[in-house]
Curated annotation (Swiss-Prot):
The keyword Methyltransferase does not apply. InterPro entries: Turandot (IPR010825). The keyword Secreted applies. A humoral factor that may play a role in stress tolerance. This is Protein Turandot Z. It comes from Drosophila persimilis (Fruit fly).
């Protein structure tokens, strides 16, 4: 019996030392959202894409906790689907090969001015989606935190 008690204390000590147990995941999400918001103008396109994808992940984590059918969530879901189909990535990197090689070859024939306009449109779309998501998440996470404190 004493071995069992000793083993349980050792396991409890190991759990405390690893620090992997989070006391409040909403606080963690709020901290991550604040990190995303602390840099309103990302340094490059890759950072903008990464920040938008992280905001999407936070949205997917918190949006499903509401009743279905809210117009705000429906609009954001539609915008996210459009963004994800236009910005296909694997492990955070743009996909390569296959059909995309054919598209890239065809894109070589497109004037640079059109490419620049398309790139600016993609950046503007990503920024708009990022802003919509972060505004939604600020309200959502603050509301969940307030509701949790009331209980």
């Amino acid at each position: 019996m004493s071995r069992l008690i000793h083993l349980s204390f050792v396991l409890a000590l190991l759990a405390c030392l690893t620090g992997t147990i989070s006391a409040n995941p909403i606080d963690d999400d709020r901290d991550r959202l604040n990190q995303l918001l602390s840099n309103p103008e990302p340094a490059d396109d890759a950072e903008l894409l990464r920040n938008t994808q992280e905001a999407i992940a936070l949205y997917k984590k918190h949006a499903r906790r509401t009743l279905p059918g809210h117009q705000v969530e429906l609009d954001l879901d539609r915008d996210i689907r459009a963004f994800e189909t236009e910005n296909l990535t694997v492990d955070g990197l743009p996909i390569q090969g296959g059909v995309w090689d054919l598209i890239k070859k065809g894109a070589d024939k497109v004037p640079d001015e059109v490419k620049d306009q398309a790139k600016e449109l993609a950046k503007t779309t990503a920024k708009a989606l990022f802003n919509k998501l972060t505004e939604y998440l600020k309200k959502k996470i603050s509301g969940e935190d307030a509701a949790k404190k009331d209980t």
